[in-house]
Amino acid sequence: MIRNFKRTAAILGVVAAGSAALVACSESEEGSTDTATNGTPAAEVEGLSGTAGQLVGEGASSQQNAMDYFNVKYQEAVSGASLAYTASGSGSGRTNFVGGQVAFAGSDSPLSEDQVEPAAERCGGNDAWHLPFVIGPVAVAYNLEGVEELNLSIPTVAKIFKGEITSWNDEAIAAENEGVELPDTNISVVYRSDESGTSDNFQKFLQAAAPEDWETDGQQFPSAVGEGANGSNGVATQVTNIDGGITYVESGF
């Protein structure tokens, strides 16, 4: 999706749909129950009706809106309980979960191979589970004064984020937007500066859809082009304030 930011920039379409997972400890077989919780009132779920205090999690900023909603519903279901979530990024969330600082992590990417064993130790010898939790479409969003709609092919998107296309009236963009009056405004790339599952999913998509134009992968986005901002809200806010700005972000922002 290509989206024009006005505080919704402009989404050029969903380019990747990330399945954001919740990473948490499993129970031992001795501690497991056969109670089905789907649609069951909190008061009828064994051990839940007496729950109180704060459940603390950390991780993907793309999950912040969902976590805010879950907190409201959790408090409605369980009197005296609440959910606190710090949107520090997928990488930080997984690290602090493995370190025992939070009860769960929200992440757009699974635990790395070298985190699996420490996570099991942190969970008292039980496996850390990856539970599909939130579907977060990743969008390419731009802010370009006077231009409400744009079409950009995936190779063109890749070349923009690599710095090979640097002006909004570049012939490659013009060829894909016949009849659109494009200004000669410089393109300002904004990327996630923190370790991010959104960066990971976006780069995986570019590699798969435009392999000749994008080579890098991973949760750390290349910093050679543009400027970085922390978190989904950070990149969205930055592009909102820059005429000619472009970023990738979970579409809810």
Model-assigned labels for residue ranges:
Residues 1-12:
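Bacterial N-terminal signal peptides that target proteins for export
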Residues 84-88, 190, 227:
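General small-molecule cofactor/ligand-binding pocket signal
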Residues 195-253:
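Ligand-binding pocket segment of bilobal, Venus flytrap-like solute-binding proteins
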